[in-house]
Amino acid sequence: MILILLGPPGAGKGTQAKLLSSELGIPHISTGDMFRDHKARGTEIGKQVQAIMDAGGLVTDDITNAMVKERLSRPDVAPGFILDGYPRTVVQAEYLDGLLRSLGRSIDRALSYEVPEELVVERISGRRSCPRCGAVYHVSQNPPHRAGFCDRDDAALVQREDDKPENVRKRMQEYGTKTEPLKRYYRDRGELSDVEGVGTPEGILAVTKKVLGR
């Protein structure tokens, strides 16, 4: 089974990807993991990605597509895979379709996790992290034992600039603008299913499996 997971920041698609990977026995492939893998291996792609990120630029479609092509050449994807964070644009989706066709394959389903904006704002703006050890907390869902301080090293917790409510709303708007054409692309092909992304991870997994006929 080949699945594509879509959803705004804070929709929980990364959590669902991990649960589905375990449930279906197929690898979870995320763009972030691919970037880190290439950087760790010191590949030419990894060096290009690092140079772009150091300059504050955006990784091009060509580089991202090349990473996906390399990843899909590995034997562990034979039974299927779950893509998280790719494709992000119609251009990438068209490339992926062509790549899969060349391999005699096609996607089974694109899943779009739908979450109300205010819930996304609450999920993300409640995050707090430790600047010393990197531990991540949430003010209501996973609070530290002592409010505002890390359990591990007692450092004062901070809120990332990106996680402030006004910036989360801005990211949601950007996501909607960029992703709507992609959702339309898969919807027009009869490959898109909307999934209610509200509830416990286990509950959302149950809904996802029902959508997939599992």
UniProtKB/Swiss-Prot annotation:
GO terms for biological process: AMP salvage. It is found in: Cytoplasm. GO terms for cellular component: cytoplasm. Transmembrane segments: none annotated. GO terms for molecular function: adenylate kinase activity; ATP binding; zinc ion binding. It comes from the Bacteria. Pfam families: ADK, ADK_lid. Keywords: ATP-binding, Cytoplasm, Kinase, Metal-binding, Nucleotide biosynthesis, Nucleotide-binding, Transferase, Zinc. Its EC number is 2.7.4.3. Its main location: cytoplasm. ATP binds at residues 10-15, 127, 136-137, 199. AMP binds at residues 31, 36, 57-59, 85-88, 92, 160, 171. Pathway: Purine metabolism; AMP biosynthesis via salvage pathway; AMP from ADP: step 1/1. Residues 126-163 are annotated as: LID. It catalyses: AMP + ATP = 2 ADP. InterPro entries: Adenyl_kin_sub, Adenylat/UMP-CMP_kin, Adenylat_kinase_CS, Adenylate_kinase_lid-dom, P-loop_NTPase. Residues 30-59 are annotated as: NMP. Catalyzes the reversible transfer of the terminal phosphate group between ATP and AMP. Plays an important role in cellular energy homeostasis and in adenine nucleotide metabolism. Consists of three domains, a large central CORE domain and two small peripheral domains, NMPbind and LID, which undergo movements during catalysis. The LID domain closes over the site of phosphoryl transfer upon ATP binding. Assembling and dissambling the active center during each catalytic cycle provides an effective means to prevent ATP hydrolysis. Some bacteria have evolved a zinc-coordinating structure that stabilizes the LID domain. HAMAP family: Adenylate_kinase_Adk. Monomer. Belongs to the adenylate kinase family. This is Adenylate kinase.
